[in-house]
Every structure is written in C-alpha cells, then in structure tokens.
Amino acid sequence: ASYRRQRQMCIRDSPNAMGGQGIDMLVPTLLEWGTEEQKQQYIESTLHGETIWCQGYSEPNAGSDLASLQTKGELIDGKWVINGQKIWTSTAQFSQMMFCLVRTEPEASKHAGISFILIPMDTPGIEIRPLVDMTLKAGFNEVFFDDVTVPEENIVGKRGEGWSVANSVLGHERGSLANPNVTLNRLNTLINLMKEETIDGRRLIDVASYRDRLLQVQGKVLAAQAHSLRLLSAKINPGQNVKLGGMIQKLVGTELRHELEGLAIDIMGELGTLYE
C-alpha cells in the first residue's frame, strides 16, 4: 500500500502526504509487532489518512544517543502514566497519535529498559510547543507529558522490547527517506525543462554532453527503483530481512539525489535550484 501510494503520488506530481510516518513506518511495524486489536484499531484508519501519526523519539539530552532517553512510563492500575519531554517532533500539532519511546524499566540497561507506546495526542497532560524557524514556519515541535495516562494495551511488543520495535521502524523509514519514485519524478521534471530551455538556439536536451550525463543518472535512478521493488518483495515475504537493503537504499538514494541536483545546477544554473 505504501509503495503504491508513493508511486501514484509521484506520477501525479502530488505534494507529500502528512500521514507518511504512519503509512510508511508505523503500519508495517504494527504488521510485524502489533496485536490483532492494534492492527484492527489503527491500520485501516492510518491508510485512509484518517489518523495522522508523529514520532516521539528525540529528547533534549537524547539525540544521537537515543537510548539515553529519560521520558518515563509507569504502569499504575492498568494504565501507563507518562512524564517527560520530546523534541524535534514533526507534525505533532496536526497529529492524532504518537508512537513514542518511553523508559519503563529504569533498573535495566538503557537499551533493554525502553518500551514502544502509542499515545493519543488529545490525552490530558500533553502540551505541544511549535519550534518556529526563521521563515516563521513550525515544522518541528516540543512535546511535554505531565502525568499523561494511556491504556496498558497501547504498548507494542512487550515491556522492554521498545528498542527492537524502534529498529523495525527505522528499517522501514530508511527505505521511505530515499524514495526512488520521488527521484524519478524529479528526473522527469528536469528532462521536460531541458526540452523547453535553449542555449544558443539549441534545446538543452539536444546538447550531447548534457544528454550523456542525463542518461547516466537515468540508469542509476531506474536501478534504484528496481532495488526498491526488491525490498518491497522482501517485506511481504516472511523471514526475509530488509534491514541491509534499506540501508543500501538510503545511502544510494541520498547520493543519487545529490548527483541529480548537481546535474540540474550544472545544466540550468540558478533555474536548476528551483526545478522541483
């Protein structure tokens, strides 16, 4: 579903969907780790865009060393009581739900003491503070939890398995961050512009040196798309590990985007910075 959505949105040159974190990252994780009740409750509404998710991972003192997070969850009378703070939370102000890493086993090692909990964003005790940048936009937020109470069954996996669940999320995130469909869409946009723009009376697409470089990049983009389909096949076949493939896609996809943007600037100058 995620691949088809991404592909169709790119074909139609649609803007990115706000629900990407839920569709691309959480849904496949719930299919792997979630209970039947969690799958029934969240997957369909997420795929339909009715439930928007944000990710509660980073904290002021837990960024690159995420396992040192201190947001605390205590199980009291069958409910998780959560206190702490998250930061750099994308789209928190628009989300209905958060998938959150919480320290529930304070006596365990830092990786073994973390649990993965689903939190409704309208729960009393949650405060969202937008982080406004120099353009006066707020893509990120701080989120504070003050005795936030959620049902015990909102935990995904078992107590203390949150780090393993989060690694599953990360594997799906790597693949979506370097979506080859987006890169292919940008390549096609560049090709169309090169057919329209001219230099000394010649279309840019007709300049042999430009066309050769374009074909080289096009071959790499199509190869990346084929690799993405291989990852998709692995995801839907039980027992196949997509972690390494996701890492490869993230690395190669990022390098390929840099190469494509550099090509656009080399060929079109300032216009190449705006062609998206």
Task: Locate predicted features.
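Single conserved hydrophobic/aromatic residue that forms the stacking wall/gate
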Residues: 1-11
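N-terminal glycine-rich flavin-associated loop
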Residues: 15-37, 63
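A short, Trp-centered hydrophobic/proline-enriched beta-strand micro-motif
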Residues: 49-57
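Glycine-rich phosphate/pyrophosphate-binding beta-alpha loops
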Residues: 62, 87-92, 134-135
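A structural signal for short hydrophobic beta-strand segments in well-ordered beta-sheet cores
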Residues: 71-74
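A short core secondary-structure module
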Residues: 79, 83-129
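Glycine-rich beta->alpha junctions and the first turn(s) of the following alpha-helix
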Residues: 126-226
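C-terminal helix-coil-helix/basic helical segment that borders enzyme active sites and/or dimer interfaces
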Residues: 199, 205-208, 222-276
